[in-house]
Amino acid sequence: MLTSHVDQIKGVKLKSSHSLYSDFFNFSHQSSAYFLFQQGVECYEGRKGGRVHYAPQKTPLGTVNLVFIDPLCQGADLPELLSEFDASQCVPNLYVCVSSRVAKPLRQRGYAINQIGAESKITLANFHVHGKKKKQLRHASHFGERNNCTVKELPWSEVDEAQVKDVSLAWLRSKGVNNRELRYATRPPVYGDEWQVRKFYCFHEGKVIAYVFFDPYFEDGKILGYCANILRARPEKACNGALDYTILEALKVFQDEGVPELSLGVAPFSNIQSDPDERPAIRVFSQFFYDYGSYFYACKGLAYHKSRYRPIETPWYLCSKDIGLVRLYWALLFGLKVAGGREI
């Protein structure tokens, strides 16, 4: 069963300027656009409008600007906005996890273009769990019946904060990220209500055992889809399947509302293909990290989980210019918090 409290969640008071939210409603076509709402993010505003959100990252070889989402702007204004932004900065700009929409004009500006991973999307109108290839999802869809669990969409005031945080701590400790919350290429969970974010919780005997937070993205003032950004579940064997069950129950709600698509996010370094304008060393390192970097991030496991939904995969890109490899990877690994000290 699933209970919805959409009206309460959508009534959260806005905390930022009207113009930013207006741009977000019109130009946040990329599923990761909501990642701009986190600490350490700066904004460049173009002369004709449009915004480039970025995070300066210090390295021993100098600062690097991490541009981690597509700019918010009209498509026709994008090349000029990127040119303005590059000219305004005195340090290199490193575009991370941007779409082909951004990679194309950067290619024309002399940037090296490397695939960084594949985003997975589901068209909700025709999604189902029938057939041999979705056997695991079909099994997960009955998790609630087998284990007496329910999924509810709730405002924060109706959730036990301690239970939710306990799920996060248990989940993080079971992963190979040394208790770090990654940022920019994703965003850490916010324990509270957030503007337009949908939060679904899986309960067993009144206790939270899993939850999924869905970030919205828009185009021309209309909801384009939701991104399953934060997925957490207790690591006990009895909870296996709770995350997929939560996603599938939320998916039913989105289908009933007529939401066009659901993004499962990007699988870092997955299905990387060569590019005529790439830096070959970056592709080699990316493949090596995908194959052997599970201590830092479980790339293979994440890619496999997404593949079970039989999604449409689209490459995202890393675009670099005038930056050495050591400086580049230092900015990436420490800026995104793939590497670094413990936090929790």
Stretches with model-predicted labels:
Residues 6-67, 96-114, 125-139, 146-282, ...:
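A conserved beta-strand-loop-helix scaffold within acyl/acetyltransferase catalytic domains
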Residues 65-76:
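Glycine-rich phosphate-binding "P-loop"
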Residues 90-94:
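Short active-site oxyanion
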Residues 286-296:
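A short acidic, glycine-rich active-site loop
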